């Protein structure tokens, strides 16, 4: 990472897939300049809310990327760069070649996907749930007709145990039997 004097690095987050890297500049900027080479990502911009804050950052990628296929989206409060890896393969252990932790760089767990999730692929087959009720054993309308519920029969709560102390007092002739007189 390098930055010129007077310039500060913007907050940057990143995530990866088997075949690409996401780099997100987590600040709303104007006068944006960016350049991606096979080994580096360079960003310059000015904070929209505070024009005295000028940002610049250069990231040295751990492995090579394909700069010709980079896409970017301005999402209002952040800029998202989708950067294809030169060669799809195992996940990178780090985004950069830097041996020290960069204070402005963090993982974006909202976009992050585990390596095992990538192996399953993006197209998970959830189609079986769409036809759940039409499947064998899924005729639920007829299942409820089998219940023998007699609406005319009264429920009996004679065998239900008491839950409060007052109910026990009522049964034993305790205070619950005393008639309360209204206040005059």
Curated annotation (Swiss-Prot):
It is found in: Cytoplasm. One of its GO terms (cellular component) is nucleus. Residues 115-184 are annotated as: Disordered. Pfam families: CS. The keyword Phosphoprotein applies. It comes from the Eukaryota. Its main location: cytoplasm. SUPFAM superfamilies: HSP20-like chaperones. Keywords: Cytoplasm, Isomerase, Phosphoprotein. It catalyses: prostaglandin H2 = prostaglandin E2. Residues 7-96 form the CS domain. Residues 175-184 have a biased composition (Basic and acidic residues). GO terms for molecular function: Hsp90 protein binding; prostaglandin-E synthase activity; protein-folding chaperone binding. Its EC number is 5.3.99.3. Cytosolic prostaglandin synthase that catalyzes the oxidoreduction of prostaglandin endoperoxide H2 (PGH2) to prostaglandin E2 (PGE2). Through production of PGE2 may regulate the activity of non-muscle myosin II in an autocrine or paracrine fashion; this may influence border cell and nurse cell stiffness to facilitate border cell migration during oogenesis. This is Cytosolic Prostaglandin E synthase. It comes from Drosophila melanogaster (Fruit fly).
């Amino acid at each position: 990472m390098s930055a010129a004097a007077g310039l500060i690095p913007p907050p940057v987050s990143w995530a990866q897939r088997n075949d690409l890297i996401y780099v997100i500049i987590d600040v709303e900027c104007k006068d944006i300049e960016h350049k991606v080479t096979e080994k580096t990502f360079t960003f310059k911009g000015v904070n929209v809310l505070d024009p005295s804050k000028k940002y610049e950052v250069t990231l040295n990628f751990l492995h090579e990327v394909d700069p010709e296929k980079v896409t970017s989206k301005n999402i209002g409060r952040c800029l998202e760069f989708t950067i294809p890896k030169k060669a799809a393969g195992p996940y990178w252990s780090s985004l950069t070649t830097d041996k020290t932790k960069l204070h402005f760089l963090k993982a974006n767990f909202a976009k992050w996907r585990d390596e095992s999730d990538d192996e399953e692929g993006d197209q998970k087959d959830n189609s079986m749930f769409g036809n759940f009720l039409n499947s064998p054993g899924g005729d639920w309308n007829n299942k409820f007709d089998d219940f023998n519920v007699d609406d005319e029969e009264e429920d009996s709560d004679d065998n239900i145990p008491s839950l409060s102390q007052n109910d026990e007092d009522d049964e034993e002739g305790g205070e619950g039997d005393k008639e309360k007189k209204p206040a005059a």
